[in-house]
Amino acid sequence: MLKNFFPNKILSLNKNLFTVLIVIMISVIIVGLINALITSPPDAVQGNSVRIMYVHVPSSFIAIGCFGFIGIASIATLIFKIKILPLMAKSMAPVGSVFCLVSIVTGSLWGKPTWGIFWVWDARLTSMLILLIFYLAYIA
């Protein structure tokens, strides 16, 4: 039955497509970072520190999204007994933890000029710290 899907052709197509998509992704990231961090004008109130938000907010969204994926994959594993879902969830944890750490660091860098201190025990900051602890516990 596997011969019906022509795995050699599909794998060669994926290899070529993967290379093209990597080149497109890297070029889009470079153009986006240049536009966000260099050509973006300073904010009237926050000045140049607003540029940190172009990295901080997406990394927070990705960290929370990865955690949501881990939760959904883990629940689906318990219900449907699909054997690849725990592997996908386990491989998503380091990615989410890196983005969570980037979110905490960039949030602290933004907080220093804005609030005058690197860390405030705000609910959002504390929840990202707890999320990082959850990630590290899940990885361990």
Can you name each region flagged by the protein language model?
Residues 2-9, 15-41, 47-48, 53-115, ...:
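Hydrophobic cores of alpha-helical transmembrane segments in multi-pass integral membrane proteins
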